[in-house]
Amino acid sequence: MLSQSSQPNQDRKLNSIALYVKDLETARNFFVKYLGAKSNEGYHNTKTSFRSYFLSFDDGARLEIMNKPEMPDFPKEFARTGYAHIAFSVGSKEKVDALTAELKADGYEVVSGPRTTGDGYYESCIVAIEGNQIEITV
């Protein structure tokens, strides 16, 4: 049984999602080019070699992409624990179709759609940077 927190939740919201990547600049360019992200100038900790960018979107959502050169990059199975995809709303079926076609033409693998799912969502899903899935929806 779910119980409600005794704390009011009107001020709670998702602030950001962080994603480690091997190629920070390629990841940054992907989100800027295809999904309209605005990037900060980046952060670099010279002692640890950690680098990151915060990518901001018009609705206030933020994605932090991060890199540590020595971090291993294990194979990413589609059926695994952890996040399944990051979804981006583009506003219309036509825009889902157009962005999916553009990504496919640019060499990204489309793994589903564009289609209407069993629960009524119009979407497509692509394998974007480094095996991570991006869902494009209305």
Regions found by a protein language model. Give the residues of each.
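Vicinal oxygen chelate
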Residues: 1-10, 54-56, 100-138
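N-terminal beta-strand motif that seeds the catalytic metal site of vicinal oxygen chelate
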Residues: 1-26, 83-88
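A short, acidic/glycine-rich surface segment
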Residues: 2-4, 40-41, 50, 70-75, ...
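Core segments of cupin and vicinal oxygen chelate
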Residues: 11, 20-62
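Exposed loop/turn and edge beta-strand positions of beta-sandwich/beta-sheet ligand-binding modules
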Residues: 49, 82, 120
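Short, charged/polar surface micro-motifs in flexible loops or helix N-caps
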Residues: 58-62, 71, 93
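Helix-adjacent hinge/juxtasegments
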Residues: 76-79, 84
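Short amphipathic alpha-helices within nucleic acid-binding modules
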Residues: 94-99
